[in-house]
A protein has these predicted regions:
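Active-site rim helix/loop that mediates acceptor-substrate recognition in acyltransferases
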Residues: 26-61
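Short hydrophobic/aromatic beta-strand or adjacent loop that forms the aromatic wall/cage
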Residues: 49-51, 143-149
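A generic "binding-loop/recognition-motif" signal
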Residues: 19, 73, 116-117
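Conserved active-site alpha-helix within GNAT-family acetyltransferase domains
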Residues: 105, 109, 115-142
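Conserved acetyl-CoA-binding loop-helix of GNAT-fold acetyltransferases
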Residues: 82, 88-101, 113
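Conserved beta-strand in the GNAT
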Residues: 53, 59-68, 73-81
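A short beta-loop-alpha structural element at the N-terminal edge
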Residues: 10-23
């Protein structure tokens, strides 16, 4: 999708507890379709240190992503959400880069995502990877079979 150029500049930053309402609202846009799992405002506030948000000048939060520790050396990129009006404006890319930076800061060796959108994650250097423990955990509860990972 081509990037839109008429949007206000965005800043990716660490989330704070004050962002919990906006982050939950963004995630909720993608829950009915099954793309994302729901997150409560309490969850977002409690784990705000694991979220990054994309904020547009004058428009507030237009995207979010969550870094979830899977093991001491592996983390998962979750809850990647971009406001519909901001699709194609580079917000998702900025959030993926923000999560990668956070994962590197925390010294994770591998970052992975579970998704059906292989092309999206391949754009950012993720490759299909088998994580047997993850496959066993999610095989009965998830319709997402693609695991995409990259070394950091």
């Amino acid at each position: 999708m081509a990037e839109k150029t008429s949007k206000a500049p965005i800043t990716v930053r660490a989330a704070t507890g004050r962002d919990s309402v906006a982050v939950r609202a963004l995630i909720d846009l993608y829950v009915p379709s099954g793309v994302l799992l729901p997150r409560s405002e309490d969850f977002v506030a409690t784990y705000a240190h694991n979220f990054v948000v994309a904020e547009a000048r004058g428009e507030g939060i237009v995207g979010c992503a969550y870094l979830d520790e899977y093991s001491p050396s592996i983390a998962e990129l979750r809850s990647l959400a971009v406001a519909p009006d901001w699709q194609g404006a580079g917000v998702g890319r900025a959030l993926v880069h923000g999560i990668e930076a956070l994962a590197r800061t925390r010294e994770y060796a591998i970052l992975f995502a579970v998704s059906n959108d292989e092309a999206y994650f391949k754009r950012y250097g993720f490759e299909r990877r088998e994580i047997p423990e993850l496959d066993r955990e999610r095989s009965e509860v998830s319709r997402y079979k693609g695991v995409y990972a990259k070394e950091l």
